[in-house]
Amino acid sequence: MQIEADVRYIADPQFTKKINEAIDLLRTQSPCAYGNLIGCVGRIRAAQRSGTNINVTPLTVDIASATFNASITWLASVLAHESLHAVQFLNKQTYTGLESEKEGNAYQLMVLRQIGAPQSEIVYMMKQTGDHFDLNKNGKYDWDDYYRRTY
């Protein structure tokens, strides 16, 4: 697994250290999520926006500062969520849109429970409807939504 800090977004050594801690939390508390991450994602890098980047090789999970600066349990659960999108992509399933995000959210909720996340994170995740990708509220995921991301 390549871990790449970027001083424009998040500097090393903090980035590498916390990402490794999140990966280790998945390894010890959520082996399935760890397996998906290690098996399907080749790189985790600091970026302006969080998400699964299928347009680069290897498949990459981008992590923005807002996500990085959250708790270790939240960061680990986001890595799990994004790795599920990598699994969907590799299995030639739909990896964007409402149903894909609902699946990712359910998976993230399961992982939050497995890794002992605070109840506040679990309750927050339970309230998510899967439409967080549609930031301009036009009913579809497009580049405008991507560029509006602050997480």
Model-derived features: positions:
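Post-HExxH zinc-binding segment in Zn-dependent metallohydrolases
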Residues: G97-H132
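Short pre-active-site segment immediately N-terminal to the catalytic Zn-binding motif
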Residues: D62-V78
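Anionic, Ser/Thr-rich low-complexity intrinsically disordered regions
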Residues: G51-I54, A80, E99, L109
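Auxiliary, metal-adjacent structural segments of Zn-dependent hydrolase domains
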Residues: M1-L59
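Pan-zinc metallopeptidase signature
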Residues: K140-Y151
